[in-house]
């Protein structure tokens, strides 16, 4: 991971941080350990997901699938009272601005409590104006459909 020159430099330096001490990490690595207990369950989940991705065609297929999922979601919300913030669209997430004095954070709460659907709330000054919808992971077009149907019900109940 590091060349010999980098390792020599690391060994001659003193870490100013308890959590980012490369020298300590290298010593632990020599004995096959990590400096702190890793998040084992997350590593297991990541390993499982990577195996699924490889079994279904690899990274290119997964990237294309995510792009299609993002496009599908964006198409489905066109007739809702929202605006897609498109200054820099990413396939991984869609930022959605609510219109007509609707409250984005309230939408987040209703989706979670009444529908069991999680979206990403925004914070700060934009808390009540913007929410984000992720497209990464083991999501499907059916998940998009379910989310958009729930959003339609929420907006209809507001009127």
Where are these regions (language model features)?
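PLP-dependent enzyme catalytic core of the Aspartate aminotransferase-like
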Residues: 125, 129-159
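Flexible, glycine/charged-enriched surface loops at secondary-structure junctions
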Residues: 56-65, 79-87, 122-124, 159
